[in-house]
Amino acid sequence: DKIDEIKRVSALSAPVKYQLKDNKVIIDFPKDFNGKKLTGEALLYCPSDENRDIRQTFSILDEPLKMKVPVTKSGLYQLQLSWQDGKTSYYFENKIFLK
């Protein structure tokens, strides 16, 4: 369940890192996932207006996840990541301000 998925993220060797650059949110997963294919969904959830949500499914291997963000979508969001490394599920969320 989600509580276990959050605990698994806390137990990783490093935190999930993200940054906003060139109208993209770039998400770096810890080295624990090197050589593992990650599949899942990323959501930029806008609490004030669900029509501003940005959702993206992904499948990556040893690369950062890049989410395009339209310039019209500035404001406070919650970054929600749900992913699997083939056998184990993980969940991460944090607030992010898009400019």
Question: Language-model features: where?
Answer:
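Short acidic/polar inter-strand loop motif in beta-rich domains
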Residues: 84-92
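Residues embedded in well-ordered secondary-structure elements
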Residues: 7, 16, 31-33, 68-70, ...
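Structured, soluble extracytoplasmic/luminal domains of envelope-associated proteins
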Residues: 25-80
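Generic hydrophobic, helix-prone segments enriched in Leu/Val/Ile
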Residues: 1-3, 58, 86
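Intrinsic-disorder/low-complexity, polar/charged segments enriched in Ser/Thr/Lys/Arg/Asp/Glu/Gln
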Residues: 13-15, 22-26, 64-66, 91
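Short beta-strand edge segments in extracellular beta-sheet folds
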Residues: 59, 95-99
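Transition segment at domain starts
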Residues: 1-22
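Short solvent-exposed loop/turn micro-motifs enriched in small/polar/acidic residues
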Residues: 9-11, 51, 89
